[in-house]
């Protein structure tokens, strides 16, 4: 189905810079997200027909569309995030490519281009309307496509009361891209049976497995002396960091793994001979494998300290989120419904693990099973990001089908 306001709504949203800031100590992490929620989203939530609309101190804009059929007793939530990833989000100037011809798309005058030879996903979209960047910023389809789709769903249902639906709760939240947005989510206040994050990629994505995730902060304490007299005295912290890294499995890196394979990822190293700090992330799907990865890092640190005769290697491990499959597989109702709706719409469900996390990873463990459905974005988090308008329309169709489902 086509929705006349969907494209303009999306273009309005992406032109607002809502980049999050991982170094901030506030919630939301940037004032621009507060302004976007209070000045743009909340007024529009009221205009499209949501009731009991309010903004919480945790950064979430919340609203409700009451059920219009007493036989549909479920309460279902839909959640998307306002922030965009760590890439330029100022001066977003989207290009609208109607009836895409399957060829190369020049991204404004930037010198960058979307070429099917480099981005095979483009082969799916001839004849469709694509929204791209101008090459100077990201687009923000992650996740403003989701926000636009949810808002358009509410607008359509309000205008078409003949479509019977259950109670719908909507939540637009902050700071998903920096991994903290759902930390303060108020599950009791949201009060639904289950929810969906509308934060996926291409048409048909339906996901209920995420990584389990941890962060590892390492400190290597060296002893710097003049290299000319260093023998037997110097302890080079840089070499300690290298030795530690070399004891990790050499093939367990993001660039060498896929599917259900986990990894260690060295994110950052700073330091000198005297001391080094290194940051890793640890990812795996199975709980035992996840715990084993953390234990392995601790074992390497302990062994090095024993061999060095002092505690020169300090490791701090912090769990970040867990595989939501552990919660959702106890009651697959949200997956069963979404799958049935997609199939009824002629959409092939793509049920694969997310090699990452979503707000749903944390919200599921707060008592609201929250799988993820497609929002349409491709090549997210950079200048090559784009989205198909037709995929966004199909996302709206899917949300409508979910809330009207009577099975």
UniProtKB/Swiss-Prot annotation:
GO annotations of cellular component type: cytosol
Active-site residues per Swiss-Prot or TrEMBL entry: 83, 176
Needed cofactors: Zn(2+)
Binding site residues for Zn(2+) 2: 142, 177, 381
Disulfide bond positions: none
UniProt remark on cofactor binding: Binds 2 Zn(2+) ions per subunit.
Location in the cell: Cytoplasm
Catalytic activity field: Release of the N-terminal residue from a tripeptide
Pfam families registered for this protein in UniProt: M20_dimer (PF07687), Peptidase_M20 (PF01546)
Name by which UniProt lists this protein: Peptidase T
Lineage: Bacteria, Bacillati, Bacillota, Bacilli, Lactobacillales
């Amino acid at each position: 189905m086509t929705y006349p306001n969907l494209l303009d709504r999306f273009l309005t949203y992406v032109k607002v810079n809502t980049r999050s800031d991982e170094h901030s100590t506030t919630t939301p992490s940037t004032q621009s997200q507060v302004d976007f929620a209070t000045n743009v989203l909340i007024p529009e939530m009221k205009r499209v027909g949501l009731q009991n609309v309010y903004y919480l101190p945790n950064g979430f804009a919340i609203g409700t569309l009451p059920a219009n059929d007493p036989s549909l007793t479920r309460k279902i939530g839909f959640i998307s995030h306002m922030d965009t990833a760590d890439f330029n989000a100022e001066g977003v100037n989207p290009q609208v490519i109607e009836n895409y011809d399957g060829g190369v798309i020049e991204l404004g005058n930037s010198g960058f281009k979307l070429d099917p030879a480099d981005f095979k996903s483009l082969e799916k979209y001839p004849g469709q309307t694509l929204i791209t960047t101008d090459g100077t910023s990201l687009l923000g389809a992650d996740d403003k496509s989701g926000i636009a789709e949810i808002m358009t769903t509410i607008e359509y249902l309000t205008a078409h009361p003949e479509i019977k639906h259950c109670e719908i709760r909507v939540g637009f939240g902050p700071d998903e891209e920096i991994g903290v947005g759902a930390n303060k989510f108020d599950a009791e206040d949201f009060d639904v049976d289950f929810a969906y994050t509308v934060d996926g990629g291409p048409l048909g994505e339906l996901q209920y497995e995420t990584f389990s995730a941890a962060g590892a902060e390492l400190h290597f304490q060296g002893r710097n002396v003049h290299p000319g007299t260093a023998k037997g005295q110097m302890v080079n912290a840089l070499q300690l960091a290298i030795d530690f890294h070399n004891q990790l499995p050499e093939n367990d890196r993001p660039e060498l793994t896929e599917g259900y394979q986990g990894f260690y990822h060295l994110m950052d190293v700073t330091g000198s001979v005297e001391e080094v700090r290194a940051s890793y992330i640890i990812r795996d799907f199975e709980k035992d494998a996840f715990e084993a990865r953390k234990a392995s890092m601790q074992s390497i640190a302990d062994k090095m300290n024993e061999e060095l005769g002092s505690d020169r290697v300090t490791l701090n491990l912090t769990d970040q989120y867990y595989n939501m499959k552990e919660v959702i597989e106890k009651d697959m109702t949200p997956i069963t419904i979404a799958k049935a709706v997609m199939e009824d719409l002629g959409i092939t469900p793509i049920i694969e693990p997310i090699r990452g996390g979503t707000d749903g990873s944390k919200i599921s463990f707060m008592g609201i099973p929250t799988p993820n459905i497609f929002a349409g974005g491709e090549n997210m988090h950079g200048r090559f990001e784009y989205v198909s308008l037709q995929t966004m329309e199909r996302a709206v169709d899917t949300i409508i089908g979910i809330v009207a489902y009577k099975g």
